[in-house]
């Protein structure tokens, strides 16, 4: 079972990725983790990637695709894998296809931007401990204060509305063409495209996924 996950930041992708991994016994392949591991191990591709990163440039699709090919040849990917954060562009999707990596399911989590902004902008953090709260879904006992220490809670830079909206714009610009691309692939019978309502309860979304992939 080879799966690609698509969904905006804050759409609940990470939570459902965990569920799919545990339910179907397949590893999650994150390009960031792979890059770090290859650089640490000093592999040929890792050395190439390090040179590019040290020069302050973006790692090329060829290097990333090479890493993915190496990674999915490992024993734990025998039953399949979950690709998270890749592909992000049409050339990357084409690259996977050219390498003969067929994808069984493309899963999209659909959540309106305003809902994501509300989810993210409502987050509050106690930085010293890493504890997080949400003004609506998981409020602290005393507004603006950490439950344990009583210290002030803050809004992280990443959770501020303007930051969230900027990230969403990037996501839509990059991913809208991919959604269309995989829609066409599905229409041609080359993959299955599944879209889930990410505004439902986490357990409901998980149940919907389990049913669709059964």
UniProtKB/Swiss-Prot annotation:
GO terms for biological process: AMP salvage; nucleoside diphosphate metabolic process; nucleoside monophosphate metabolic process. It catalyses: AMP + ATP = 2 ADP. It is found in: Cytoplasm. Its main location: cytoplasm. ATP binds at residues 10-15, 123, 132-133, 200. HAMAP family: Adenylate_kinase_Adk. This is Adenylate kinase. It comes from Vibrio cholerae serotype O1 (strain ATCC 39315 / El Tor Inaba N16961). The gene is adk.
């Amino acid at each position: 079972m080879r799966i690609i996950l698509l969904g905006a930041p804050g759409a609940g992708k990470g939570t459902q990725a965990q569920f799919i991994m545990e339910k179907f016994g397949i590893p999650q392949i994150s390009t960031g983790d792979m890059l770090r591991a290859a650089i640490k191990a000093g592999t040929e591709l890792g050395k190439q990637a390090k040179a590019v990163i040290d020069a302050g440039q973006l790692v090329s699709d060829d290097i990333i695709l090479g890493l993915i090919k190496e990674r999915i040849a490992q024993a734990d990917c025998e039953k399949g894998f979950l690709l998270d954060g890749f592909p992000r562009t049409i050339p990357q999707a084409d690259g996977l296809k050219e390498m003969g990596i067929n994808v069984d399911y493309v899963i999209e989590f659909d959540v309106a931007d305003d809902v994501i902004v509300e989810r993210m902008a409502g987050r509050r953090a106690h930085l010293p401990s890493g504890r997080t709260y949400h003004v609506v879904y998981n409020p602290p006992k005393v507004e603006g204060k950490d439950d344990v220490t009583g210290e002030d809670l803050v809004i992280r830079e990443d959770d501020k509305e303007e930051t969230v909206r900027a990230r969403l714009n990037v996501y839509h610009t990059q991913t809208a063409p991919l959604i269309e691309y995989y829609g066409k692939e599905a229409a041609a019978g080359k993959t299955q495209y599944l879209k889930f309502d990410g505004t439902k309860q986490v357990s409901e979304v998980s149940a919907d996924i389990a049913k669709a992939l059964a």
